[in-house]
Amino acid sequence: MSEASGLRARLVDVLRRDGGLTRDDLTRAFATVPREVFLADGFHSQDAGLLRPGDDGFLAGVYRNDALVTKLADGRPVSSSSQPSLMALMIEELGVAAGMRILEIGAGTGYNAALMAALGADVTSVDVQPDVAAKAADALRTAGVTGARVLIGDGYLGEPSGAPYDRVMVTVGVTGISPHWLAQLVPGGLIVAPVAHAGNNPVLRVWTEPAARIAEPGWPPRTDIWAGGVCGAGFMAAGGALGATYPWAHPASVRAADWAALEEVETARWPQPLDGLRYHDLWFGIGAWDRRTTGAPYDGGTGCVLLDETRTGGAAILADGAILAAGAHAATYASDAGILVDRWADLGMPGIERWRAALVLGGDPAAPIYVPREWSLV
């Protein structure tokens, strides 16, 4: 067994052990599709800088369960290969199967398209960056993948030439769902997308249902597009229409330089801090109830905060339930945050998958998107 094959097998073991990989056919795809081929120009490691094929640690890095940054612009990541466990979860959630036509928004390295093609799907991947699209297409050819094509284009518009699609996979953080994707989707089709929510991009499952009523004079427009939570996540944000804001959106995340010094106002609620997944469950719930919620750096990382109007203060919610606060209205924000945390705990600490929202048109009127309006527990 080659080094790469052994590392692939080890990655598969990790994904299956952690519960992100349950399908046998997808397990075979991860065990056979060579991720290193899709990283021919290397990736940016936090520890070792740019790692290229042949460098010490390159293959080991390729087969860690990590997202790998593949392109920087002014020092900012603009393209990557997503975390394998997240890829597996999204592919399983989408229910990708042989014979399906898949529209992928955001080509990345082409690895995700290769995995779906290995399941027998016909994948059309669209990326707005010509160099990213070209490299992904080259990698797919090198890997011998015949069931996927990569096109240069505005993801907002989808790709009519391959429609209708059974599924839409979105691999870039968006603020809403393009009407073009819905128009190019078969009846009963599904979309899985990371949609902006409270400073994060949790993965949502989007579907349509027959309208509960027909719109009549004096009635609001019918709503038949729904979203449900899948898991917490962070993705690089899309620009243009797919990144447009809307009046009831959460505030943008704040920079470390803008955030005032925090002081503890309420001590820990739980003896053991929530793990990453459960903390994102809490964060999602807080954001569903309070539009002041976003992300901000504190305590060595980025976490959930209620942001005040100055964007330099408010309340931060820690994984152990403690509340930190800063600013002129620190006490008020801390009290509000504590009430929200207790509400979530009293409801049994609901996970992201318990939330559902109707989608309504928002964003740029010239290029609208469907965005969540109000979230409810189901």
Regions found by a protein language model. Give the residues of each.
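Generic alpha-helical structural signal
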Residues: 9, 134-137, 338
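Class I SAM-binding transferase module
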Residues: 169, 174-295, 370
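Intrinsically disordered, low-complexity terminal regions of plant proteins
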Residues: 244, 248-351, 355-378
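Conserved nucleotide-cofactor-binding alpha/beta core module
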Residues: 82-192, 196-200, 204
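Short, functionally important structural connectors and interaction interfaces within domains
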Residues: 13, 55, 60, 78, ...
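Class I SAM-dependent transferase core
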Residues: 2-103, 119, 132, 146, ...
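Solvent-exposed amphipathic alpha-helical surface segments
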Residues: 18, 143, 344-348
